[in-house]
Protein backbone atom coordinates (compact mmCIF):
# COMPACT_ATOMS: atom_id res chain seq x y z
CA UNK A 1 0.00 0.00 0.00
CA UNK A 2 2.80 2.36 0.91
CA UNK A 3 4.59 1.58 -2.33
CA UNK A 4 1.42 2.23 -4.32
CA UNK A 5 0.99 5.59 -2.58
CA UNK A 6 4.58 6.47 -3.39
CA UNK A 7 4.12 5.56 -7.03
CA UNK A 8 0.95 7.69 -7.25
CA UNK A 9 2.57 10.70 -5.65
CA UNK A 10 5.76 10.34 -7.64
CA UNK A 11 3.83 10.53 -10.91
CA UNK A 12 3.00 14.13 -10.11
CA UNK A 13 6.61 15.24 -10.54
CA UNK A 14 8.48 14.50 -13.74
CA UNK A 15 12.04 15.49 -12.89
CA UNK A 16 14.17 16.26 -9.89
CA UNK A 17 15.94 19.59 -9.81
CA UNK A 18 18.53 21.09 -7.54
CA UNK A 19 17.39 23.68 -4.99
CA UNK A 20 17.12 27.30 -6.08
CA UNK A 21 20.29 29.36 -6.14
CA UNK A 22 19.30 31.13 -2.91
CA UNK A 23 19.59 27.88 -0.96
CA UNK A 24 22.75 26.55 -2.57
CA UNK A 25 26.13 26.78 -0.96
CA UNK A 26 28.46 29.17 -2.69
CA UNK A 27 30.89 27.01 -4.61
CA UNK A 28 33.78 28.20 -6.73
CA UNK A 29 32.95 25.45 -9.16
CA UNK A 30 31.35 25.13 -12.54
CA UNK A 31 27.66 24.55 -11.87
CA UNK A 32 26.01 21.53 -13.44
CA UNK A 33 22.36 20.65 -13.83
CA UNK A 34 21.72 17.36 -12.06
CA UNK A 35 18.42 15.55 -12.24
CA UNK A 36 17.02 12.10 -11.57
CA UNK A 37 13.62 10.64 -12.48
CA UNK A 38 11.48 10.19 -9.37
CA UNK A 39 10.99 6.51 -10.23
CA UNK A 40 14.75 6.05 -9.94
CA UNK A 41 14.80 7.21 -6.32
CA UNK A 42 11.75 5.14 -5.44
CA UNK A 43 13.30 1.97 -6.85
CA UNK A 44 16.43 2.42 -4.76
CA UNK A 45 14.82 3.53 -1.54
CA UNK A 46 12.09 0.89 -1.61
CA UNK A 47 14.73 -1.81 -1.69
CA UNK A 48 16.42 -0.86 1.55
CA UNK A 49 13.51 0.74 3.41
CA UNK A 50 11.19 -2.26 3.47
CA UNK A 51 10.85 -4.16 6.76
CA UNK A 52 11.23 -7.97 6.65
CA UNK A 53 7.53 -8.72 6.09
CA UNK A 54 7.61 -6.50 3.00
CA UNK A 55 10.87 -7.89 1.67
CA UNK A 56 9.23 -9.98 -1.01
CA UNK A 57 7.28 -6.98 -2.27
CA UNK A 58 10.47 -4.96 -2.51
CA UNK A 59 12.28 -7.70 -4.37
CA UNK A 60 9.37 -8.05 -6.80
CA UNK A 61 10.56 -4.87 -8.49
CA UNK A 62 11.90 -6.01 -11.89
CA UNK A 63 15.68 -6.34 -11.94
CA UNK A 64 15.80 -4.27 -15.13
CA UNK A 65 14.18 -1.39 -13.23
CA UNK A 66 16.73 -1.68 -10.43
CA UNK A 67 19.60 -1.70 -12.93
CA UNK A 68 18.09 1.32 -14.68
CA UNK A 69 17.84 3.12 -11.34
CA UNK A 70 21.44 2.37 -10.48
CA UNK A 71 22.57 3.60 -13.89
CA UNK A 72 20.69 6.89 -13.50
CA UNK A 73 22.11 7.52 -10.02
CA UNK A 74 25.60 6.68 -11.26
CA UNK A 75 25.19 9.24 -14.06
CA UNK A 76 24.19 11.85 -11.48
CA UNK A 77 27.22 11.03 -9.35
CA UNK A 78 29.47 11.39 -12.38
CA UNK A 79 27.93 14.78 -13.18
CA UNK A 80 28.61 16.01 -9.67
CA UNK A 81 32.16 14.69 -9.69
CA UNK A 82 32.90 16.57 -12.91
CA UNK A 83 32.59 19.84 -10.95
CA UNK A 84 35.46 18.82 -8.67
CA UNK A 85 33.36 18.77 -5.49
CA UNK A 86 34.69 17.14 -2.35
CA UNK A 87 33.17 13.82 -1.28
CA UNK A 88 31.00 15.54 1.32
CA UNK A 89 29.81 18.29 -1.05
CA UNK A 90 29.08 15.73 -3.73
CA UNK A 91 27.16 13.59 -1.26
CA UNK A 92 25.07 16.54 -0.13
CA UNK A 93 24.23 17.59 -3.66
CA UNK A 94 23.34 14.12 -4.93
CA UNK A 95 21.31 13.29 -1.84
CA UNK A 96 19.47 16.61 -2.16
CA UNK A 97 18.38 15.55 -5.64
CA UNK A 98 17.08 12.24 -4.33
CA UNK A 99 15.50 13.65 -1.18
CA UNK A 100 13.64 16.62 -2.65
CA UNK A 101 11.58 14.61 -5.11
CA UNK A 102 10.72 11.97 -2.55
CA UNK A 103 9.88 14.35 0.28
CA UNK A 104 6.05 14.18 -0.01
CA UNK A 105 6.04 10.40 -0.21
CA UNK A 106 8.72 9.90 2.41
CA UNK A 107 6.94 12.14 4.91
CA UNK A 108 3.83 9.97 4.73
CA UNK A 109 4.82 6.51 3.54
CA UNK A 110 8.49 6.04 4.32
CA UNK A 111 9.49 8.22 7.30
CA UNK A 112 12.04 5.64 8.36
CA UNK A 113 13.82 5.80 5.02
CA UNK A 114 13.89 9.57 5.24
CA UNK A 115 15.37 9.56 8.75
CA UNK A 116 17.89 6.89 7.91
CA UNK A 117 18.86 8.64 4.71
CA UNK A 118 19.39 11.98 6.41
CA UNK A 119 21.53 10.39 9.10
CA UNK A 120 23.43 8.28 6.58
CA UNK A 121 24.44 11.42 4.74
CA UNK A 122 26.09 12.66 7.94
CA UNK A 123 28.35 9.63 7.99
CA UNK A 124 30.69 11.52 5.69
CA UNK A 125 31.40 13.83 8.62
CA UNK A 126 33.58 13.06 11.69
CA UNK A 127 30.51 12.27 13.80
CA UNK A 128 30.28 8.82 12.27
CA UNK A 129 29.31 6.71 15.27
CA UNK A 130 26.51 8.98 16.52
CA UNK A 131 24.98 9.38 13.08
CA UNK A 132 25.22 5.65 12.49
CA UNK A 133 23.50 4.95 15.80
CA UNK A 134 20.62 7.34 15.07
CA UNK A 135 20.08 5.97 11.59
CA UNK A 136 20.16 2.43 12.89
CA UNK A 137 17.64 3.23 15.63
CA UNK A 138 15.34 4.92 13.12
CA UNK A 139 15.30 1.87 10.88
CA UNK A 140 15.00 -0.61 13.74
CA UNK A 141 11.95 1.22 15.10
CA UNK A 142 10.09 0.00 12.01
CA UNK A 143 10.94 -3.60 12.82
CA UNK A 144 13.69 -3.85 10.22
CA UNK A 145 17.03 -5.26 11.39
CA UNK A 146 19.39 -2.67 9.96
CA UNK A 147 22.60 -3.92 11.58
CA UNK A 148 23.69 -6.10 8.62
CA UNK A 149 23.05 -3.17 6.29
CA UNK A 150 25.18 -0.77 8.30
CA UNK A 151 27.92 -3.31 8.86
CA UNK A 152 28.19 -3.93 5.12
CA UNK A 153 28.13 -0.23 4.26
CA UNK A 154 30.57 0.62 7.06
CA UNK A 155 33.01 -2.02 5.80
CA UNK A 156 33.15 -0.32 2.42
CA UNK A 157 33.51 3.15 3.90
CA UNK A 158 36.02 2.30 6.63
CA UNK A 159 38.46 0.72 4.22
CA UNK A 160 38.06 3.60 1.79
CA UNK A 161 38.78 6.18 4.48
CA UNK A 162 41.88 4.44 5.83
CA UNK A 163 44.06 4.97 2.79
CA UNK A 164 45.10 7.65 0.35
CA UNK A 165 44.16 5.29 -2.47
CA UNK A 166 40.60 5.39 -1.19
CA UNK A 167 38.62 4.44 -4.23
CA UNK A 168 40.89 1.74 -5.65
CA UNK A 169 41.19 0.00 -2.29
CA UNK A 170 37.46 0.16 -1.63
CA UNK A 171 36.34 -1.27 -4.95
CA UNK A 172 37.15 -4.94 -4.35
CA UNK A 173 35.53 -4.81 -0.93
CA UNK A 174 32.45 -3.13 -2.35
CA UNK A 175 32.19 -5.83 -4.98
CA UNK A 176 32.69 -8.56 -2.39
CA UNK A 177 30.00 -7.08 -0.18
CA UNK A 178 27.55 -7.11 -3.06
CA UNK A 179 28.22 -10.65 -4.25
CA UNK A 180 25.30 -11.76 -2.08
CA UNK A 181 22.85 -9.90 -4.33
CA UNK A 182 22.46 -13.08 -6.38
CA UNK A 183 21.07 -14.90 -3.34
CA UNK A 184 17.50 -16.16 -3.57
CA UNK A 185 16.77 -15.08 0.01
CA UNK A 186 14.71 -11.83 -0.17
CA UNK A 187 16.00 -10.59 3.18
CA UNK A 188 19.60 -10.98 2.02
CA UNK A 189 18.84 -9.07 -1.17
CA UNK A 190 17.23 -6.23 0.79
CA UNK A 191 20.25 -6.04 3.11
CA UNK A 192 22.66 -5.99 0.17
CA UNK A 193 20.63 -3.32 -1.61
CA UNK A 194 20.59 -1.28 1.57
CA UNK A 195 24.36 -1.53 1.82
CA UNK A 196 24.63 -0.32 -1.76
CA UNK A 197 22.42 2.69 -1.14
CA UNK A 198 24.18 3.69 2.07
CA UNK A 199 27.61 3.22 0.52
CA UNK A 200 26.47 5.48 -2.31
CA UNK A 201 25.54 8.14 0.23
CA UNK A 202 28.76 7.73 2.17
CA UNK A 203 31.26 7.55 -0.64
CA UNK A 204 29.74 8.17 -4.09
CA UNK A 205 32.69 6.93 -6.19
CA UNK A 206 32.43 3.48 -4.61
CA UNK A 207 28.88 3.23 -5.94
CA UNK A 208 30.23 2.37 -9.39
CA UNK A 209 31.94 -0.71 -8.01
CA UNK A 210 28.79 -1.77 -6.18
CA UNK A 211 26.41 -1.21 -9.08
CA UNK A 212 28.65 -3.44 -11.21
CA UNK A 213 27.19 -6.41 -9.37
CA UNK A 214 23.65 -5.38 -10.19
CA UNK A 215 24.34 -4.47 -13.80
CA UNK A 216 26.35 -7.56 -14.66
CA UNK A 217 29.15 -5.72 -16.46
CA UNK A 218 31.56 -2.89 -15.66
CA UNK A 219 29.68 0.07 -17.10
CA UNK A 220 28.69 2.29 -20.02
CA UNK A 221 31.16 4.54 -21.82
CA UNK A 222 30.22 7.51 -23.95
CA UNK A 223 31.64 7.57 -27.49
CA UNK A 224 34.07 10.31 -26.40
CA UNK A 225 35.27 8.25 -23.43
CA UNK A 226 35.64 5.22 -25.69
CA UNK A 227 37.76 7.14 -28.18
CA UNK A 228 39.97 8.53 -25.42
CA UNK A 229 40.54 5.11 -23.84
CA UNK A 230 41.34 3.47 -27.17
CA UNK A 231 43.88 6.18 -27.94
CA UNK A 232 45.52 6.61 -24.55
CA UNK A 233 44.96 3.43 -22.53
CA UNK A 234 45.25 -0.29 -23.06
CA UNK A 235 41.63 -0.88 -24.09
CA UNK A 236 40.24 -3.05 -26.89
CA UNK A 237 36.94 -2.56 -28.70
CA UNK A 238 35.00 -5.46 -30.17
CA UNK A 239 32.47 -4.51 -32.86
CA UNK A 240 29.74 -7.17 -32.86
CA UNK A 241 27.55 -5.57 -35.53
CA UNK A 242 26.68 -7.55 -38.63
CA UNK A 243 28.48 -6.90 -41.90
CA UNK A 244 25.23 -5.49 -43.29
CA UNK A 245 24.93 -2.97 -40.43
CA UNK A 246 28.52 -1.84 -40.85
CA UNK A 247 28.13 -1.47 -44.61
CA UNK A 248 25.04 0.67 -44.03
CA UNK A 249 26.12 2.82 -41.06
CA UNK A 250 29.92 2.74 -41.27
CA UNK A 251 32.55 2.19 -38.59
CA UNK A 252 34.04 4.54 -35.96
CA UNK A 253 36.66 6.89 -37.34
CA UNK A 254 39.82 6.28 -35.31
CA UNK A 255 43.40 7.56 -35.30
CA UNK A 256 45.93 5.16 -36.79
CA UNK A 257 47.30 4.21 -33.36
CA UNK A 258 43.86 3.00 -32.25
CA UNK A 259 42.73 1.05 -35.31
CA UNK A 260 44.64 -2.07 -34.32
CA UNK A 261 42.72 -2.10 -31.03
CA UNK A 262 39.43 -2.83 -32.75
CA UNK A 263 38.29 -6.34 -33.63
CA UNK A 264 35.17 -7.27 -35.56
CA UNK A 265 33.25 -10.31 -34.35
CA UNK A 266 29.84 -10.11 -36.05
CA UNK A 267 26.85 -11.70 -34.41
CA UNK A 268 25.94 -14.76 -36.45
CA UNK A 269 22.29 -15.49 -37.06
CA UNK A 270 21.25 -18.97 -36.00
CA UNK A 271 19.93 -21.35 -38.67
CA UNK A 272 16.13 -21.46 -38.84
CA UNK A 273 16.09 -25.04 -37.56
CA UNK A 274 18.02 -24.02 -34.46
CA UNK A 275 15.91 -20.89 -33.92
CA UNK A 276 12.86 -23.11 -33.69
CA UNK A 277 14.18 -25.08 -30.74
CA UNK A 278 15.71 -22.35 -28.55
CA UNK A 279 13.82 -19.97 -26.26
CA UNK A 280 15.71 -16.80 -27.15
CA UNK A 281 17.72 -16.87 -30.35
CA UNK A 282 19.07 -13.33 -29.90
CA UNK A 283 20.50 -14.22 -26.50
CA UNK A 284 22.07 -17.40 -27.85
CA UNK A 285 23.67 -15.46 -30.72
CA UNK A 286 25.11 -12.92 -28.28
CA UNK A 287 26.41 -15.61 -25.92
CA UNK A 288 28.13 -17.37 -28.83
CA UNK A 289 29.82 -14.07 -29.72
CA UNK A 290 31.00 -13.73 -26.11
CA UNK A 291 32.47 -17.23 -26.23
CA UNK A 292 34.40 -16.33 -29.39
CA UNK A 293 35.75 -13.19 -27.75
CA UNK A 294 36.95 -15.20 -24.77
CA UNK A 295 39.11 -17.33 -27.10
CA UNK A 296 40.91 -14.42 -28.76
CA UNK A 297 44.67 -14.59 -28.23
CA UNK A 298 45.05 -10.88 -27.59
CA UNK A 299 42.41 -10.91 -24.84
CA UNK A 300 42.86 -12.27 -21.32
CA UNK A 301 40.78 -12.05 -18.16
CA UNK A 302 42.49 -8.82 -17.15
CA UNK A 303 41.82 -7.08 -20.46
CA UNK A 304 39.71 -3.95 -20.71
CA UNK A 305 37.07 -4.77 -23.31
CA UNK A 306 34.55 -2.38 -24.88
CA UNK A 307 31.63 -3.94 -26.75
CA UNK A 308 30.02 -2.03 -29.61
CA UNK A 309 26.78 -2.95 -31.34
CA UNK A 310 24.06 -0.94 -33.06
CA UNK A 311 21.81 -0.18 -30.07
CA UNK A 312 23.42 -1.94 -27.02
CA UNK A 313 20.82 -4.72 -26.62
CA UNK A 314 23.19 -7.47 -27.72
CA UNK A 315 26.25 -5.70 -26.28
CA UNK A 316 24.80 -5.96 -22.77
CA UNK A 317 24.29 -9.71 -23.14
CA UNK A 318 27.81 -10.16 -24.50
CA UNK A 319 29.32 -8.11 -21.65
CA UNK A 320 27.34 -9.99 -18.99
CA UNK A 321 28.31 -13.35 -20.48
CA UNK A 322 31.98 -12.36 -20.54
CA UNK A 323 31.73 -11.41 -16.87
CA UNK A 324 30.38 -14.89 -16.10
CA UNK A 325 33.33 -16.32 -18.02
CA UNK A 326 35.71 -14.37 -15.78
CA UNK A 327 36.28 -11.23 -17.87
CA UNK A 328 35.30 -8.54 -15.39
CA UNK A 329 36.51 -5.41 -17.17
CA UNK A 330 33.81 -5.31 -19.83
CA UNK A 331 32.12 -2.09 -20.93
CA UNK A 332 29.60 -1.16 -23.60
CA UNK A 333 29.38 1.99 -25.71
CA UNK A 334 26.38 4.07 -24.60
CA UNK A 335 23.56 3.63 -27.15
CA UNK A 336 25.89 1.69 -29.42
CA UNK A 337 26.80 2.98 -32.85
CA UNK A 338 23.41 4.13 -34.15
CA UNK A 339 21.45 5.08 -31.00
CA UNK A 340 20.43 8.55 -29.88
CA UNK A 341 23.62 9.08 -27.85
CA UNK A 342 25.72 6.63 -29.81
CA UNK A 343 28.82 7.05 -31.92
CA UNK A 344 27.01 8.26 -35.04
CA UNK A 345 25.36 11.12 -33.14
CA UNK A 346 28.52 12.03 -31.26
CA UNK A 347 30.01 13.78 -34.31
CA UNK A 348 33.30 11.99 -33.78
CA UNK A 349 33.20 10.90 -37.40
CA UNK A 350 32.66 7.60 -39.21
CA UNK A 351 34.46 5.86 -42.04
CA UNK A 352 33.01 3.74 -44.82
CA UNK A 353 33.33 0.04 -44.13
CA UNK A 354 35.14 -2.24 -46.54
CA UNK A 355 34.50 -5.88 -45.74
CA UNK A 356 37.56 -7.08 -47.63
CA UNK A 357 39.81 -5.19 -45.19
CA UNK A 358 38.05 -6.16 -41.96
CA UNK A 359 39.58 -8.26 -39.23
CA UNK A 360 36.80 -10.76 -38.65
CA UNK A 361 36.29 -13.82 -36.49
CA UNK A 362 34.51 -16.25 -38.77
CA UNK A 363 32.52 -19.29 -37.59
CA UNK A 364 35.58 -21.54 -37.87
CA UNK A 365 38.72 -19.39 -37.70
CA UNK A 366 40.26 -16.03 -36.96
CA UNK A 367 41.44 -14.30 -40.13
CA UNK A 368 44.98 -13.06 -39.33
CA UNK A 369 45.30 -9.36 -38.74
CA UNK A 370 48.40 -9.35 -40.95
CA UNK A 371 46.27 -10.01 -44.00
CA UNK A 372 43.11 -8.21 -42.91
CA UNK A 373 42.78 -5.15 -40.72
CA UNK A 374 40.27 -2.38 -40.27
CA UNK A 375 40.48 0.00 -43.18
CA UNK A 376 38.46 2.59 -45.01
CA UNK A 377 37.64 3.61 -48.50
CA UNK A 378 38.38 7.16 -49.49
CA UNK A 379 35.03 8.46 -48.36
CA UNK A 380 34.41 9.65 -44.81
CA UNK A 381 30.93 10.15 -43.37
CA UNK A 382 30.09 12.99 -41.02
CA UNK A 383 26.81 14.25 -39.67
CA UNK A 384 25.64 17.57 -41.12
CA UNK A 385 27.38 20.59 -39.60
CA UNK A 386 30.09 18.43 -38.02
CA UNK A 387 32.92 20.37 -39.65
UniProtKB/Swiss-Prot annotation:
Residue numbers on the Stromal membrane side: 208-387
Tissue: Predominantly expressed in the shoot, including guard cells.
Gene3D superfamilies membership: Rhodanese-like domain
Gene Ontology biological process terms, A to Z: cellular response to calcium ion; de-etiolation; regulation of stomatal closure
Membrane topology: Single-pass membrane protein
Keyword check for DNA-binding: no
Boundaries of every Rhodanese domain copy: 231-352
Keywords, alphabetical: Chloroplast, Membrane, Phosphoprotein, Plastid, Receptor, Thylakoid, Transit peptide, Transmembrane, Transmembrane helix
Modifications after synthesis and translation: Phosphorylation seems to be light-dependent.
Name recorded for this polypeptide: Calcium sensing receptor, chloroplastic
The organism of origin for this protein: Arabidopsis thaliana (Mouse-ear cress)
Amino acid sequence: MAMAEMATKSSLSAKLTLPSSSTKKTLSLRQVSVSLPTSTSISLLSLFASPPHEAKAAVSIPKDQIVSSLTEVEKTINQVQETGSSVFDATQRVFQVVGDALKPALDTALPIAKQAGEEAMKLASPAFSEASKKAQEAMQSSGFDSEPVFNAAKTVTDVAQQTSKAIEDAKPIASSTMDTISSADPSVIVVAAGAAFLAYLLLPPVFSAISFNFRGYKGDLTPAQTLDLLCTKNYLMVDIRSEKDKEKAGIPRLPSNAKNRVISIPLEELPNKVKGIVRNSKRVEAEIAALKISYLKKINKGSNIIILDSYTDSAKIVAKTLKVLGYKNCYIVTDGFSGGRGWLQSRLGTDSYNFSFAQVLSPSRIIPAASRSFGTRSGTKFLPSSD
